[in-house]
């Protein structure tokens, strides 16, 4: 009887701040039978980017002052963009992330604050909050156990989603009982960056609850056609603007171009320009995938050269700010091809450009006549497709439940139904304002 009562009062409350693709934040609050106050934890603290949910950017499902630590899965703004605002509302703790993610977070903290002030926008935080964030960042090592206290430990594992991405396995312990929660963040099994730790070569035996994404829903991996489209466009004499802004990695694009050069599909005389967000993005790994005739756009003068160089060229941009500079200058020119490798949402610019030439396109408050040829592919998606989701799930022998976040409602619903039908899993959809209690061997809704 004593053991049953103990388990009844041993649970972890889980709540998501988001019902959509952006604004990722997972809040965990443990409850132990002995009544001991245990650390409240937050995983990711991302910005809402869509107009419908931007109003929630100052709202959190927890009191920041009560949070013991924040753990970031990767450096994309929809996973870390509200960190300074979290400090503004009372957070005093540390922010743990991979060494690379820490570099990006620090770089963005002050820059974003001054960008907001420069554009006369209402800041969501003060300069002191950005400074607190910079000094609060702590790099973590892959595979190293972090003992948060005697009852809670955490390990970060490699995640192939993007550079510096990790997934976290958190274990809450009480006597011989354990509640294990795996938070993947955005997930990719394998990429040019390497392979994710899970699924591993041996199936994981312990009872586990998985919190993961559902960006692509039940989509199968698309047929690769980027190289074919690029070769055709270049053969027609077009210059190329390729947007890898968002979660799609520019390394994949550059490596595809490099392999095409090596195969004689692209002349090495064609200059390749790359504009990235941070100078330190050019790591040793990046250098290994760089094509011939490569030029880094690292200041306004080189940017002008990239645009006005009359030779046929390829420009790859890895951030939205750079894209807003190039796009208005090429959209109305028939000798340009515009490639999108992002996930194409309804109403997105990529979707609106999949229209005939001569269509009027509205962008940043202005109208442009579309004459350039637009292409789209999701073959470089940094998010898993259905087969990778199945492989992830099959890597665990005893799954308590699966929670789906980071996706549109339809995508999450489709994946939920597929997983329940084929795997017999308890699959729940994370929604803003809803919470769950995770027990050792079950889950239930929480008020």
Regions flagged by a language model, labelled:
Residues 332-372:
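Redox- and metal-dependent alpha/beta enzyme cores, enriched for Fe-S-associated oxidoreductases
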Residues 190-274, 360-425:
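Cap/insert and terminal regions of metallo-dependent hydrolase folds
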Residues 219-223, 295-306, 316-323, 356-359, ...:
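A general structural motif
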Residues 227-349, 405:
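Hard-cation-handling environments
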Residues 148-157, 284-292, 389-392, 439-447:
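Short, surface-exposed amphipathic charged segments that create phosphate/polyanion-binding patches used
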Residues 68, 207-208, 313-314, 336, ...:
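Conserved acidic residues
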Residues 2-71, 76-80, 85-252, 258-265:
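His/Asp/Glu-rich metal-coordinating catalytic cores
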Residues 135-143, 294-302, 429-430:
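Short acidic-hydrophobic, aromatic-tinged amphipathic segments that line or gate anion-handling sites
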């Amino acid at each position: 009887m004593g053991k049953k009562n103990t388990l009844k009062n041993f649970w972890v409350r889980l709540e998501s701040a988001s019902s959509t693709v952006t604004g990722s934040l997972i809040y965990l609050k443990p409850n132990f039978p002995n009544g001991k106050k245990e650390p409240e934890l937050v995983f990711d603290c991302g910005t809402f980017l869509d107009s419908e949910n931007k109003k929630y950017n100052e709202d959190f499902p927890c009191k920041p002052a009560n949070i013991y630590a924040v753990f970031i899965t990767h450096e994309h703004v929809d996973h870390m963009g509200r960190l300074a605002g979290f400090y503004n509302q009372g957070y005093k703790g540390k922010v743990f992330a991979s060494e690379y993610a820490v570099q990006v977070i620090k770089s963005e903290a002050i820059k974003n604050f001054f960008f907001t002030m420069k554009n006369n926008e209402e800041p969501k935080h003060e300069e002191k909050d950005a400074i607190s964030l910079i000094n609060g960042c702590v790099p973590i090592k892959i595979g190293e156990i972090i003992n948060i206290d005697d009852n809670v430990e955490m390990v970060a594992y490699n995640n192939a989603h993007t550079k510096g991405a990790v997934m976290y396995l958190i274990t809450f312990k009480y006597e011989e009982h354990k509640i294990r929660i795996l938070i993947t963040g955005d997930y990719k099994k394998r990429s040019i960056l390497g392979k994710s730790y899970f699924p591993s070569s041996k199936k994981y035996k312990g009872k586990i609850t998985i919190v993961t994404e559902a960006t692509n829903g039940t989509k199968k991996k698309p047929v690769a056609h980027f190289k074919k489209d690029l070769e055709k466009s270049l053969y027609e004499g077009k210059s190329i603007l390729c947007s890898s802004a968002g979660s799609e990695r520019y390394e994949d694009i550059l490596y595809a171009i490099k392999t095409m050069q090596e195969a004689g599909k692209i002349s090495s005389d064609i200059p390749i320009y790359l504009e990235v967000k941070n100078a330190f993005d050019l790591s040793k790994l990046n250098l290994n995938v760089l094509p011939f005739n490569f030029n880094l756009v690292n200041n306004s003068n080189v940017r002008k050269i990239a645009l006005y160089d009359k030779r046929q060229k390829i420009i790859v941009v890895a951030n939205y700010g750079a894209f807003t500079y190039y796009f208005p200058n090429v959209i109305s020119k028939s000798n340009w091809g515009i490639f999108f490798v992002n996930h194409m949402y309804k109403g997105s610019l990529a979707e609106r450009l999949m229209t005939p030439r001569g269509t009027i396109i509205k962008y940043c408050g202005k109208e442009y006549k579309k004459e350039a040829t637009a292409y789209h592919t999701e073959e470089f998606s940094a998010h898993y497709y259905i087969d990778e989701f199945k492989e992830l799930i099959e890597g665990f022998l005893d799954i308590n439940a699966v929670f789906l976040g980071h996706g549109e409602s339809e995508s999450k619903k489709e994946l939920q139904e597929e997983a329940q039908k084929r795997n017999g899993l308890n699959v729940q959809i994370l929604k803003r304002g809803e919470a769950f209690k995770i027990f050792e061997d079950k889950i239930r809704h929480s008020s």
